[in-house]
């Protein structure tokens, strides 16, 4: 546990920690697993706010995140999609909604992007990876058309 996080309570299957946000170098939170039993390794790690502990599996998008995103008329997904330096060329290389993390070099899943737009009721500014094939662009457009309300604007930008 490090950067802006400090552990303060340990119990079976749980570590509680306090985060004191800073803007200095090496800020944020990191968790490092140093040792585990190979026969029964640590698994299913979740980092959630205490108030979201019992409902996070039902709703990945926390109230704070949605409130923050909801203040904008258009949400640019460049960083959330990992556009800069993205390795994605083909549609099957995008992050899947059911993957164990959305913090991938390929960015968040397009399904999660659509969910954010539906929940906030905002417009989307979507950046296409610079290596994306024509098939990727077509499938992205088809998915967004089918899964985002027609009264939302979707701006598409090639790369950054």
What are these regions (language model features)?
Residues 1-160:
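Non-catalytic accessory regions flanking glycosidase/transglycosidase catalytic cores in CAZymes
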């Amino acid at each position: 546990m490090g950067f802006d996080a400090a552990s303060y309570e340990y119990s079976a299957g749980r570590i509680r920690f306090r985060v004191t946000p800073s803007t200095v170098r090496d800020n944020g939170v990191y968790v490092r697993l140093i040792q585990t039993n190979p026969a029964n390794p640590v698994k299913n790690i979740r980092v959630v706010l205490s108030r979201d502990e019992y409902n996070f599996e039902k709703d990945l998008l926390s109230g704070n995140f949605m409130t923050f995103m909801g203040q904008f008329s258009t949400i640019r997904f460049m960083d959330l999609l990992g556009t800069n330096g993205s390795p994605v060329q083909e549609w099957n290389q995008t992050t899947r909604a059911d993957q164990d993390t959305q913090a991938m070099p390929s960015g968040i899943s397009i399904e999660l992007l659509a969910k954010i737009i539906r929940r906030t009721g905002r417009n989307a500014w979507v950046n296409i990876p610079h290596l994306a094939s024509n098939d990727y662009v077509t499938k992205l457009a088809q998915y967004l058309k089918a899964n985002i309300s027609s009264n939302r604007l979707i701006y598409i930008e090639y790369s950054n």
